[in-house]
């Protein structure tokens, strides 16, 4: 068998998966990110608005990279038993390996001299000379148990080591590396953790040691003359993987629970002061702290790298309402006129401004107790207030003599919505008339230095049961849009009272919180809406045809809770960033939705309390009212440079299905995290995430493209979803949008919450129409179903349903042979069967025309290739074997097809574990991949299969493989791309 030869065949070109290590080099200008064997280097210098990928280096390691250390020559890297020095400027790699697993390393005083700590609690001293490595000394600890982790620190000529065993003990020991002994006694034993330790760190002065464990705790130890446990930190809800000391007595930890937590400590306690979230799935594996800036970088199992500003905190102040006004009155309303400047209005018309200089009273509007609401126009000195008697006051808060009072409504004004575009100021006011009836006016104002001018007032005709909640204006084409409390959207011409169009259930029956115009054309508007239901939707809205339906280009559930607003900001690079804010339980949150990062949470009591929010890119303010107190929160967080995503990932859990579109430039991936992700596949093997949707409630089981614009996914809970690919230029990029859900049968007699649709096969049903698809699904209860789907009407109908046995069915693939549709089905009993489905006649029961036991246990992979009437079925099994059956199809009558076996190949123990992927390359060549992470190439020689080539994949928990022309992708926990080379 060829193991290391034929480098041009199955050559690894890319790996996308968990970020296992991070390091900063060159005065923290460059961030090194390790994924599998791939080392990616980013420029994260302050001068750059956005981090750029500078270089990608593929290391010749058999194991993935587990750790990195900045050194004089560039970067010292280790993974498993391998280690290397990488010259990041020339991409030169000097590597070697030792016999034991490496846990940590340090650079000694001299150049190209290092020490590594291994799993046997030994230290190897290494020297690099003229490109060759030498182990100059090996120092053993007196205790040599199996280790879980270790750390090392150099102080003068001393090497200090802390190592944690599988028996929950921590050993601290040291020696002089200029005169190293062969064996070293232990200085300190530390005992206290109730589970294995996963990381250890010395403080910079060497006085303290931090440890984290599977018992979910962080522990801080004093390791001076009389070692003892200082404190234990509780807060993580799952295993804690990494820790690091920060300046000013702070510690950062990351965990399986997807949180980055900051801790402060003193001589007795550890306190969790701040928690950051943003990674997806499970596990944050790595973190590193910048010494140049207050930034922490984290790398997750989802493959993303994120940066966090850990110094900018939220400042809180509390002011009694009674101290704001001269008389005994109640607070009516408040709003931000700009960030950190809050304008408060009392019932009797008194006003006060609160800013970072304190509070200041301004002249009152009126002396009657009838004021109800106040709102501001962003970035102006003008505000609008309303009374319970229907009067609107528009004025400058800097000079209340610039006042215009307008008696407009007949009763209490319940809502004011403001909108500014260039020098035009719009105000929408609403009062209650009757049940589901409102009187609404739209006014336009012009503000001069000494006067407030009312340009126009229009009473709007509202659609039935339309309660306005949001407003936006399209000045270019003189339109405005109003969102309602029940998820409807109405389009008007400026200056006209009648609405042009109304569209219902844009956000089902929940309120539209904000509307943003992304593009304005003569025939349509491209708008983004934020709904109280937690969704951000992108629509193409027609201007002309009243009956036309908005086309949904994207719909994304942002988070749990309710969304109260959103903001889009165009960046210097031409891209747009989306922020949303709202409430979850008693917390107010601001979220960077583009990067799927929570910026901050504030415990304010919930959305039912009066509140106000204002944000700029470098400052944010929130205020809430409860118990006659105003609570004001401010932070100076730079939203464009902090808490951002440097590298996007794929999935936070195992990828269970992938498929190429027919054109080969797009990929679809589905994972245990229940998300379906659209990816761009580039000609060099790079994979770029485009967008993801979540419409499954359990892990994805299978995916398939039918055409370049129609795709399907299946999962647990009997879920079958249909999607459409949107590629219109106004959508800015390719997106998948949800089109149809096949709802399970939930009758008491038949519904099974554990029932899974394990695979799907889709072909065109030309005998039923050009736009009709025939869908076959197989289920875990041994049921096979046949559906028709009309692409135009989106109608999904079940045509047939039948059972195989009682075992789980795992794969299905349709083959059209003449006028027949044959369905190849694999199951957990090791059988592969071919059914004649009689798809042209719904009344005829499907019939098994061929069945064979190909494995002792479950069939784990299935591949079918066809050459006219010859069908080749390749399988991999739970028994580690591979099988190949070559069959001849023959139609002997109009309703009858027979299958004749031409040849059967079988190789027992082909792999050491389940074979999760098989792929026919040619008639003579077959590829297989297994949980054992080996890729094998097989060749047909006579009556047998012979392995001729072996490659290793860094993908753990391999789920399968797919091919696209010259590329092969192995997927599981992440995915790895190989170039087939001459195999193609």
From Swiss-Prot:
Swiss-Prot/TrEMBL GO biological process terms: tRNA methylation; wobble position ribose methylation
InterPro entries: tRNA_Anticodon_Mtase-Reg (IPR051973), WD40/YVTN_repeat-like_dom_sf (IPR015943), WD40_repeat_dom_sf (IPR036322), WD40_rpt (IPR001680)
Protein's recorded name: tRNA (34-2'-O)-methyltransferase regulator trm734
Residue ranges of WD repeats: 14-52, 142-183, 192-231, 235-275, 278-318, 326-364, 366-407, 461-502, 507-549, 650-689, 695-733, 752-797, 806-845, 854-899, 910-949
Cellular component terms (Gene Ontology): cytoplasm; cytosol; nucleus
Keywords carried by this UniProt record: Cytoplasm, Nucleus, Repeat, tRNA processing, WD repeat
Summary of the function given for this chain in its UniProt record: Together with methyltransferase trm7, methylates the 2'-O-ribose of nucleotides at position 34 of the tRNA anticodon loop of substrate tRNAs. Required for the correct positioning of the substrate tRNA for methylation. Also plays a role in the regulation of the retromer complex and is required for the recycling of plasma membrane proteins from endosomes.
Localization in the cell: Cytoplasm; Nucleus
One MF term in the entry's GO annotations: tRNA binding
Gene symbol of the encoding locus: trm734
Organism name: Schizosaccharomyces pombe (strain 972 / ATCC 24843) (Fission yeast)
Family indicated by similarity: Belongs to the WD repeat WDR6 family.
Disrupted gene: phenotype observed: Loss of methylation of the 2'-O-ribose of guanosine at position 34 of the tRNA anticodon loop of tRNA(Phe). Increases occurrence of 1-methylguanosine residue at position 37 in the tRNA anticodon loop of tRNA(Phe) and decreases occurrence of wybutosine at this position. Slow cell population growth.
């Amino acid at each position: 068998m060829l193991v290391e030869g034929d480098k041009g065949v199955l050559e690894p070109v890319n790996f996308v998966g968990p970020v296992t290590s991070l390091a900063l080099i060159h005065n923290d200008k460059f961030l090194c990110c390790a994924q599998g064997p791939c080392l990616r280097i980013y420029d994260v210098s302050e001068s750059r608005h956005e981090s750029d990928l500078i270089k990608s280096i593929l290391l010749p390691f058999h194991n993935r990279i587990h750790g990195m250390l900045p050194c004089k020559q560039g970067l010292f890297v280790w993974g498993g038993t391998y280690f290397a020095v990488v010259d990041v400027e020339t991409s030169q790699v000097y590597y070697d390996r030792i016999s034991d697993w490496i846990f940590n390393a340090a650079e000694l005083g001299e150049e190209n001299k290092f020490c590594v700590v291994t799993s046997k609690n030994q230290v190897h001293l290494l020297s690099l000379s003229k490109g060759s490595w030498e182990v100059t000394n090996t120092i053993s600890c007196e205790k040599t148990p199996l280790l879980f982790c270790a750390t090392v620190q150099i102080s003068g000529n001393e090497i200090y080591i802390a190592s944690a065993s599988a028996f929950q003990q921590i050993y601290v020991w040291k020696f002089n590396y200029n005169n190293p002994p062969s064996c070293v006694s232990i200085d300190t034993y530390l005992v206290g953790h109730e589970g294995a330790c996963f990381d250890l760190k010395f403080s910079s002065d060497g006085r303290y040691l931090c440890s984290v464990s599977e018992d979910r705790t962080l522990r801080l130890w004093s390791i001076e003359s009389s070692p003892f446990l200082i404190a234990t930190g509780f807060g993580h809800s799952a295993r804690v993987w990494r820790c690091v000391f920060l300046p000013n007595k702070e510690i950062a930890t990351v965990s399986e629970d997807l949180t980055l937590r900051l801790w402060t400590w003193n001589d007795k306690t550890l306190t969790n002061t701040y928690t950051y979230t943003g990674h997806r799935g499970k596990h944050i594996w790595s973190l590193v702290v910048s010494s140049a800036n207050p930034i922490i970088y984290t790398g997750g199992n989802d493959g993303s790298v994120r940066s966090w500003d850990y110094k900018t905190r939220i400042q809180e102040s509390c002011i009694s309402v009674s101290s704001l006004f001269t008389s005994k009155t109640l607070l009516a309303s408040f709003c931000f006129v700009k960030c950190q400047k809050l304008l408060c209005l009392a019932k009797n018309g008194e006003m006060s401004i609160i800013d970072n200089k304190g509070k200041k009273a301004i002249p009152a509007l009126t002396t009657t107790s009838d004021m109800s609401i106040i709102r501001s126009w962003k970035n102006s000195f003008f505000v609008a207030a309303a009374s319970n008697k229907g009067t609107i006051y528009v004025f400058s808060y800097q000079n209340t003599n610039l006042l215009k009072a307008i008696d407009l409504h007949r009763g209490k004004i319940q809502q004011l919505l403001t909108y500014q575009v260039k020098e035009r100021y719009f105000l929408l006011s609403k009062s209650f008339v009757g049940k589901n009836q409102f009187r609404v006016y739209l006014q336009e104002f012009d503000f001069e230095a000494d006067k407030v001018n009312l340009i126009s007032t229009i009473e709007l005709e509202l659609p039935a049961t339309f309660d306005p909640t949001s407003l936006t204006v399209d000045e270019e084409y003189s339109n405005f849009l109003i969102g309602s409390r029940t998820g409807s959207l109405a389009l008007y011409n400026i200056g006209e009272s009648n609405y042009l169009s109304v569209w219902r259930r844009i956000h089902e029956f929940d309120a539209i919180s904000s509307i943003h115009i992304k593009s304005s054309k003569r025939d349509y508007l491209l708008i983004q809406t934020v709904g109280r239901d937690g969704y951000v939707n992108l629509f193409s809205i027609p201007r002309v045809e009243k009956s036309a339906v908005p086309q949904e280009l994207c719909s994304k559930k942002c988070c749990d809770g309710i969304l109260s607003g959103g903001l889009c900001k165009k960046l210097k690079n031409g891209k747009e960033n989306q922020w949303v804010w709202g409430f979850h339980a008693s917390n107010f949150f601001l979220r960077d939705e583009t990067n799927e990062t929570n910026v901050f949470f504030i415990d304010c009591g919930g959305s039912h309390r009066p509140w106000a929010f204002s944000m700029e890119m470098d400052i944010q303010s929130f205020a809430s009212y409860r118990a006659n107190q105003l609570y004001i929160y401010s932070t100076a967080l730079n939203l464009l440079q902090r808490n951002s995503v440097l590298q996007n990932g794929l999935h936070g859990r195992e990828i269970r299905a992938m498929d190429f579109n027919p054109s080969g430039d797009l990929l679809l991936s589905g994972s245990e995290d229940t998300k379906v992700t659209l990816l761009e596949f580039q000609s060099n093997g790079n994979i770029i995430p485009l967008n993801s949707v979540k419409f499954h409630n359990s892990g994805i089981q299978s995916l398939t493209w039918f055409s370049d614009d129609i795709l399907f996914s299946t999962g647990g809970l009997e879920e079958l979803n249909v999607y459409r690919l949107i590629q219109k230029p106004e959508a800015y990029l390719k997106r998948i949008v949800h089109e149809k859900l096949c709802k399970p049968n939930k009758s008491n007699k038949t519904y099974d919450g554990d029932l899974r649709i394990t695979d799907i096969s889709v072909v065109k049903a030309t005998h039923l129409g050009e736009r009709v698809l025939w869908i076959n699904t197989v289920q875990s209860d041994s049921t096979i179903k046949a559906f028709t789907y009309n692409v135009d009407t989106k109608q999904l109908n079940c045509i047939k349903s039948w059972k195989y046995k009682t075992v789980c069915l795992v794969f299905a693939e349709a083959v059209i042979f003449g006028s027949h549709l044959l369905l190849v089905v694999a199951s957990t009993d090791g059988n592969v069967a071919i059914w004649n489905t009689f798809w042209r006649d719904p009344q005829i029961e499907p019939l098994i025309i061929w069945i064979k036991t190909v494995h002792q246990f479950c069939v784990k992979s299935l591949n079918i290739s066809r050459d006219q009437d010859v069908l080749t079925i390749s399988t991999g099994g739970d028994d580690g074997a591979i099988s190949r059956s070559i069959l001849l199809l023959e139609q002997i009558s109009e309703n009858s097809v027979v299958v004749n076996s031409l040849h059967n190949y079988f190789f027992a123990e082909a792999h050491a574990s389940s074979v999760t992927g098989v792929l026919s390359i040619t008639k003579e060549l077959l590829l297989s991949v297994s949980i054992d992470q080996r890729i094998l190439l097989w060749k047909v020689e006579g009556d047998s299969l012979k392995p001729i080539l072996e490659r290793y994949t860094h993908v753990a928990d391999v789920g399968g493989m797919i091919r696209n022309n010259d590329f092969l992708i192995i997927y599981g926990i992440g995915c790895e791309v190989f170039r087939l080379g001459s195999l193609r």
